Amino acid sequence: MSISALGGRTKGKPLPPGEEERNNVLKQMKVRTTLKGDKSWITKQDESEGRTIELPSGRSRATSFSSAGEVPKPRPPSTRAPTGYIIRGVFTKPIDSSSQPQQQFPKANGTPKSAASLVRTANAGPPRPSSSGYKMTTEDYKKLAPYNIRRSSTSGDTEEEEEEEVVPFSSDEQKRRSEAASGVLRRTAPREHSYVLSAAKKSTGPTQETQAPFIAKRVEVVEEDGPSEKSQDPPALARSTPGSNSADGGRTKASRAIWIECLPSMPSPAGSQELSSRGEEIVRLQILTPRAGLRLVAPDVEGMRSSPGNKDKEAPCSRELQRDLAGEEAFRAPNTDAARSSAQLSDGNVGSGATGSRPEGLAAVDIGSERGSSSATSVSAVPADRKSNSTAAQEDAKADPKGALADYEGKDVATRVGEAWQERPGAPRGGQGDPAVPAQQPADPSTPERQSSPSGSEQLVRRESCGSSVLTDFEGKDVATKVGEAWQDRPGAPRGGQGDPAVPTQQPADPSTPEQQNSPSGSEQFVRRESCTSRVRSPSSCMVTVTVTATSEQPHIYIPAPASELDSSSTTKGILFVKEYVNASEVSSGKPVSARYSNVSSIEDSFAMEKKPPCGSTPYSERTTGGICTYCNREIRDCPKITLEHLGICCHEYCFKCGICSKPMGDLLDQIFIHRDTIHCGKCYEKLF
């Protein structure tokens, strides 16, 4: 039934209102869809009806206004696609509508553009590849869109439009854009440069100028807060090449390394290393892997150590290291341990299993001896917030009272260190004919060291201010330290004062734990941290889960003690919980394994060791036998012991309790709250608020 029939039939009879509306809607829809099969009526047009019928005439009408030169060009595309295009992401209306703006545009300019365009397009052929939308503003593009449709298949018209857009560029405009692009270049990564450059007009002059500064002859990775310290020696920076990395020839494996060297002379031969760099601290920050592990290689800590002036230099370096790695500036004091500075913070996989890549990161203060001993203990880790987890494989500095302390700093890294700690072959151990070594030992009084005496007697070496013992301090921040490190002495390295090349006692004994090996004579010693001498960096929220494993043949002392080393100069207090287990059977067998699990619930890392309670400085015999429990006043023998050093609490694990409700807290060290120097359990602490 046709609409007319429908309308005619219903004219005489009154229709219900709903039917009337329905008929109106049907009528409108039928008319529009019949006449406008392309559905272009959806876009608002003045001549909504009858347009399809008039399309040919409409086209001729449209073209009649435009110049003769333009007539042949629009026609072929328009006949093929009357419904519209999407060009460069902009939907363009059908030809009939686009012809209307086109009629006005040439007249708006006052002259038909086609004549000019024909002239221009003749010489516009070469620039055609550069016809890109970058040069147009949005408004200009909207004006051009209709013409782009019609000229899309023609060779010259797009260039014509491009040319018209390019012409307005004055030299000032070009200079302004080039400067803007070069400004962006300075701030963006190299991979983005090409894109940015394309934004400016590609004229060779300015572009080359802007690119020139980016050819980096040396990239110095320095935090803004501490550039001066790191750039102590610009020449050293220049020297920081892979060749210099391989001071021992073994470090050449560190590719992609950016070295930041603090001190001028870097000894290249291993043998001359100790003597030559004696007054000089070379602390190189090596960025070894994309994971941003920084490796502080202190090849000559001895040199650093030998002169007091160097110590001051070391401190800044170590501080910067900490700042760079942990983003913190905790280590301000010049007396920062060389342990810190020389701690080699290398990414976990840096030296893994490669003797050659043995990074020398003896973070030992008196590393000079070990340095001399050429034991490169590489400490690979990412430093926890300025808490240097000093995990040092304590190598037996047998007759050498000064040993090495390596700082192992792990920041949340579950440090899968995979490092092979190896001693350099043939390098005499400190104290064995290395003159630099003895001078260095006393240099840093505040570093703990552990000393193994060749006599085989278990002896406790306290961390005296002279620091003549090597302390292996392992602090991990949430590190459950999977330290896959094989500490090996390379064969033929005579032990300090021992001269026994066959004493490679540090074998990759336990890949998952830092080990301290005492001399084969089985002399075991315990290192005590003297209150006055040791600096504790209290690791902020440092939970160390250390697996303590001793290989049967060699005595190892694992003291992963999170008692972090801090500058004693700092004033703020840190809270250090030490839960210490001493296995009497192993002690008697010459293998004291003291794993100190510490959970530091205070984020303040400044903890002055002077506040250490007397129990901290009791001799080893007393510590193994005990100390006096703060709560029950009985001796602490072989039981687990809990020490809160700044509160003066030293007690049995089972005696440790909440100071308010007396709830046993020995197994709840992670739920301790200290308020006004009183231990609170979680519930009592909540009641305070």
Curated annotation (Swiss-Prot):
Q: Where is the composition biased (Acidic residues)?
A: 157-166
The protein depicted here goes by the name: Zinc finger protein 185
Coiled-coil parts of chain? none
The UniProt entry lists the main location of this chain as: cytoplasm
Q: Which GO terms describe its molecular function?
A: zinc ion binding
Please list where the region (Disordered) is annotated.
1-253, 298-534
What is the documented function of this protein?
May be involved in the regulation of cellular proliferation and/or differentiation.
Keyword list (alphabetical) reads: Cell junction, Cytoplasm, Cytoskeleton, LIM domain, Metal-binding, Phosphoprotein, Zinc
InterPro entries recorded for this chain?
Answer: Cell_Prolif/Cornif_Regul, Znf_LIM
Spans of biased composition, class Basic and acidic residues? 35-52, 217-232, 310-331
Q: Which Gene3D superfamilies match?
A: Cysteine Rich Protein
